[in-house]
Amino acid sequence: MASTWAIQAHMDQDEPLEVKIEEEKYTTRQDWDLRKNNTHSREVFRQYFRQFCYQETSGPREALSRLRELCHQWLRPETHTKEQILELLVLEQFLTILPEELQAWVQEQHPESGEEVVTVLEDLERELDEPGEQVSVHTGEQEMFLQETVRLRKEGEPSMSLQSMKAQPKYESPELESQQEQVLDVETGNEYGNLKQEVSEEMEPHGKTSSKFENDMSKSARCGETREPEEITEEPSACSREDKQPTCDENGVSLTENSDHTEHQRICPGEESYGCDDCGKAFSQHSHLIEHQRIHTGDRPYKCEECGKAFRGRTVLIRHKIIHTGEKPYKCNECGKAFGRWSALNQHQRLHTGEKHYHCNDCGKAFSQKAGLFHHIKIHTRDKPYQCTQCNKSFSRRSILTQHQGVHTGAKPYECNECGKAFVYNSSLVSHQEIHHKEKCYQCKECGKSFSQSGLIQHQRIHTGEKPYKCDVCEKAFIQRTSLTEHQRIHTGERPYKCDKCGKAFTQRSVLTEHQRIHTGERPYKCDECGNAFRGITSLIQHQRIHTGEKPYQCDECGKAFRQRSDLSKHQRIHNRRGTYVCKECGKSFRQNSALTQHQTIHKGEKSVSV
């Protein structure tokens, strides 16, 4: 049968669409009261325009006329400016070139411009870079269903996919849509996904018609095609009870319970839906529309009494309050660790089970979290959008760029709570902390202290006096190689660590970090006894000896002890017959530099008198 049909009535008119197949007329009961500013109606006409087939017309003139009409209904030049039309075309292409892993997620946000897409993607990138509990809520009974839905999402594109759009109408029940949005939250860990699920459980417009109309279009166009029961549930008896289930009066869709029947009839195109005047989105319940409209008005009526933060929905406020109460009701049966959200527990349990649901299509590598897959994909695409302005090195993640910039600035944001040592990278801090937490099984026979194997070897050199690392210039020896490297900079004059504020350079990174606190005024090391604060950990240790009375530096000549090494060095010059500091004018020697400086003023005075 040749499917030559023509649009008899424009969509602008308050008449239903008439479709002509051969000599018979079929009037679809699809709700064609699509407002001109409705985003979803524009999407329908865009798909008609893109999927239009030449064979559906009687000749080239009719084909051109039909294409013009569909394009007019999509772009609407009578209401849109040239800039708005260009933006629609750019948006369409932008969505098309996105990776498949991102397309479905971005389209869930219903962006209306390219800038909105960029904002959504940048927000996602920031959330993936920030550690923390991912947000999602779904019950344990849904777990098996959600796993199946994840599989279905991986096997095919969503109904609004721009890469592989098919002209086949699709209908999804509100239960299925809600559960799929929950799966999306698990995959991305996106806070907005939960807000959308809890506050504005929006319904996609139903009954999207295809470009080819079948004979039974008047029936199927109202609600679209439905999935068979066995596709969305694992219950084997679902098909056998099909004849006993209630059905929709409009299209014969089988429903499991009377409550489903009532809910289904509410969302059927034959029933009135609640549409948003601002963006055109439709909802099955008036309460959902009211909550959705708060996105446009900015109204946040639910306020936290603890911190004053406001939210659009009550359920989001309830979840937020867990932060203040510290409640962690979800506990892991394997290790006993507790979590504030079920989704965080679910992801944690994959560490014990070894489950990895997210697979890379290029190399097959699997990941337990969606965030891990997103970052891995950039290896194949070689996408490194974040560039360092100092050395032009590029990175795939903003967080890695931020850490890298610490190499140039000398910033060390990751500090050990045990010893105060700071690091540029968080991974370096984690490795360092293992020194404190690791079981120390190797004990020193001299003093009884315990160390790791390598730590014990270095420690024993204190007792044996062994210094295997020797300077080639001055032959000074050191216990550790790092100490030798830092010492050699005295001879080479190398000062690789430079202060951005004053330009002063240093041989050691730790000295630069302590110096920078002069500019910032930061004094992170505080004495528990008197409350005095210090810039460096060594200054605090020396100060604490005032309270403890400890004097670890002892003179070998007379046995006198001192708190600081510098005080011992000054004292030892008393025993040395020759003075350390010699005046270049007269050759006189002094034990202290301050005495030499004071002496040199005499020569300066003599020179001024003679002049």
Curated annotation (Swiss-Prot):
Biological processes annotated in GO: regulation of transcription by RNA polymerase II
InterPro entries per the UniProt record, alphabetical: C2H2-ZF_domain (IPR050752), SCAN_dom (IPR003309), SCAN_sf (IPR038269), Znf_C2H2_sf (IPR036236), Znf_C2H2_type (IPR013087)
Entry superkingdom: Eukaryota
Stretches assigned to the SCAN box domain: 46-128
PROSITE patterns associated with the record: SCAN_BOX, ZINC_FINGER_C2H2_1, ZINC_FINGER_C2H2_2
Zinc-finger ranges (C2H2-type): 274-296, 302-324, 330-352, 358-380, 386-408, 414-436, 442-463, 469-491, 497-519, 525-547, 553-575, 581-603
Pfam families cross-referenced by the UniProt entry: SCAN, zf-C2H2
Protein keywords: DNA-binding, Isopeptide bond, Metal-binding, Nucleus, Repeat, Transcription, Transcription regulation, Ubl conjugation, Zinc, Zinc-finger
Family: Belongs to the krueppel C2H2-type zinc-finger protein family.
Function: May be involved in transcriptional regulation.
Annotated protein name in UniProt: Zinc finger and SCAN domain-containing protein 12
Originating species: Homo sapiens (Human)
Gene from which this protein is expressed: ZSCAN12
